[in-house]
């Protein structure tokens, strides 16, 4: 990869790291808005919640002042969770248990250990907190230990210890992580238990494109090799398209990998609809991804008009 392409590639990696702003899965800050701190939850309420995986916030936080703050932060987390799910299809509400602090190593990260997907369900003036699915180990912790310190975390054993415990932030979990990372004594293993909005999608994206390929280099340099196509190929499209749009559709039908940069109002939505129609005409399927649900909704009228038998 050329120097210019590598610089562009590194810039893209930095942009991916910044997706969504500060990420509690890479640097947990317990003082931010939209975070319910359960580290000092009432022992009885926490014990019942640990067994049933459901509980009212009022039972978990019984001090009036602390409960008022927890209720306010739960409302913020709920609003943000609903917005991210509606607009981007992301489920972002998690219980985070335990943390590893890397800051003594001049690495600005405080990474939670275990994630457990959660729900906040309105119950009158209160919220019911519910845990769903199974807990997972934070991918950011696994990858940071592997690439920064050559430590392979025993994920199955860690999860087994966690699920067998009667606590949501058990000493056995913290002790096991300390044992696994004993080659780096500067690491600080901390007991934390919070509910907040988080997603590990940027982490997976970042490491998924760690090794650039020819497509990445073409995108980074803007230099695309000549493509040889059958000039007589005329795609079957359901709506009008100019010459450039037709070329894009033709390249899709030829199975090429490429990106198109355009401005709003230049017909990109209709071009996508034409691509879907052309693929349908060849009995092919297509998966359409978009950063916002609104973008997908804009395609619906075209589908109703051009693809009534979908």
Task: Give the predicted meaning of each segment.
Residues 121-124, 279-284, 305-309:
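Secondary-structure transition/capping motifs at alpha-helix termini
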Residues 254-275:
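Walker A/P-loop
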Residues 268-271, 275-299:
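Conserved RecA-like ASCE P-loop NTPase motor core of nucleic-acid helicases/translocases
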Residues 295-310:
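Conserved helix-turn-beta segment of the N-terminal RecA-like "Helicase ATP-binding" lobe
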Residues 237-253:
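N-terminal pre-P-loop "Q-motif" helix
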């Amino acid at each position: 990869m050329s120097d210019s392409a590598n610089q562009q590639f590194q810039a893209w990696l930095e942009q991916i790291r910044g997706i969504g702003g500060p990420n509690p899965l890479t640097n947990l800050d317990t003082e931010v808005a939209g975070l319910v701190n359960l580290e000092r939850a009432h022992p009885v309420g926490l014990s019942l919640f640990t067994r049933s995986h459901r509980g009212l916030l009022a039972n978990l936080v019984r001090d009036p002042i602390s409960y008022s703050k927890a209720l306010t932060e739960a409302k913020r987390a709920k609003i943000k969770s609903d917005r991210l799910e509606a607009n981007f299809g992301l489920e972002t509400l998690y219980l985070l248990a335990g943390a590893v602090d890397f800051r003594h190593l001049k690495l600005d990260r405080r990474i939670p250990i275990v994630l457990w997907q959660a729900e906040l369900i309105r119950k009158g003036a209160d919220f019911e907190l519910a845990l769903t699915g199974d807990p997972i180990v934070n991918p950011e912790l696994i990858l940071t230990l592997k690439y920064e310190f050559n430590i392979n975390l025993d994920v199955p054993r860690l999860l087994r210890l966690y699920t067998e415990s009667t606590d949501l932030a058990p000493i056995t979990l913290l002790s096991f992580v300390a044992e696994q990372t004993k080659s780096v004594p500067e690491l600080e293993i901390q007991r934390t238990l919070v509910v907040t909005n988080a997603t590990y999608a940027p982490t997976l994206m970042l490491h998924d494109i760690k090794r650039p390929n020819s497509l990445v280099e073409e995108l980074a340099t803007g230099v695309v090799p000549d493509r040889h196509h059958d000039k007589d190929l005329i795609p079957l499209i359901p709506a009008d398209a100019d010459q450039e749009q037709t070329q894009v559709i033709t390249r899709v039908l030829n199975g090429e990998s490429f990106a198109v940069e355009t401005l709003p109002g230049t017909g990109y939505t209709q071009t996508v609809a034409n691509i879907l129609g052309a693929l349908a005409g060849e009995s092919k399927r297509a998966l359409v991804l978009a950063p916002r649900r609104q973008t997908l909704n804009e395609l619906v009228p075209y589908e109703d008009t051009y693809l009534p038998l979908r």
